[in-house]
Amino acid sequence: MTSTLDVSKVLGLLDQVLAERKASGDPEASYVAQLHHKGLNKILEKVGEEATETILAAKDAERSGNTDLLVCETADLLFHAMVMLSHLGSNTDAVMAELARRFDLSGLEEKASRK
């Protein structure tokens, strides 16, 4: 099993690669650079597609008890969400900071604070 430190390192390295591909990647040679080149609407289309595939994989996992496909689809969803964040000038550090802020709140308290 991967430790928390390893997960943070993976996310940080991926954030770095995404930023590099956005800044100077060749759309002919890099999928991420190609997504950035095509713009936000294409990136959002991919996020939506991956979200749908994740939902379908979750339903399959519930029936079969096998979460392998669900894990793969969730990784795809997270990856494309990270591309979206990168495209808009943010990264997973901001998301992790928000999750950390919410950690000491109950779900209902956190939801009420957004109103």
Swiss-Prot record:
GO terms for biological process: L-histidine biosynthetic process. Pathway: Amino-acid biosynthesis; L-histidine biosynthesis; L-histidine from 5-phospho-alpha-D-ribose 1-diphosphate: step 2/9. GO terms for cellular component: cytoplasm. Its EC number is 3.6.1.31. Signal peptide: none annotated. It is found in: Cytoplasm. Pfam families: PRA-PH. One of its GO terms (molecular function) is phosphoribosyl-ATP diphosphatase activity. It catalyses: 1-(5-phospho-beta-D-ribosyl)-ATP + H2O = 1-(5-phospho-beta-D-ribosyl)-5'-AMP + diphosphate + H(+). Belongs to the PRA-PH family. This is Phosphoribosyl-ATP pyrophosphatase. It comes from Saccharophagus degradans (strain 2-40 / ATCC 43961 / DSM 17024).
